[in-house]
Amino acid sequence: PEPTPAPPPSLPAPAAGRTVNAIPVSGTVRIKRRGSRRYVTLRAGDQIPVGSTVDARNGRVTLETAGGGRADFFDGLFRIGQGRGARPLTTLTLTERLDCRRRAATSRRKPKRRRLWGSGSGRFRTAGRYSAATIRGTRWLVTDRCTSTTTRVAEGSVTVRDRVKRRTVIVRAPRSYTARRRR
């Protein structure tokens, strides 16, 4: 009989406000640790410090946080932030550059946008330019454009905080909510 391969070593538990566990699921996921200038490819699970930037535009990554949160993220570039306490809120801020100059907006090319898909449960929030979405065990997409941030819910529900109107709404699947900048 063939020997079975040993399971990968488990990662230590994430520390609230300090570290999260990042496990690549598919594709290429790159990490830029807080304080570093370069990205490195995430080959196996790793514990990364809060404040790091994750490039999951060409891959899918699972994040495990203190307090038992676990969710997959893909198709986006984001920075990880996290509070302290027994069940900290983990905030993923979209960081890909938006070119919002008038010349870029009127060009024939597709308008610039940044986005992030998420799927899972725990205390996660994805923050765009004009709104932030806090998950409630679901699958969702946040898309940032120069003039708006749209949260689309594919499964479950999401609490969206509109930073412009200063109001909070609950968005249930299959609906979406768009927060627009002031005119």
Tell what function each PLM region has.
Residues P3-R183:
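Flexible, surface-exposed loop/linker segments and immediately adjacent secondary-structure boundaries
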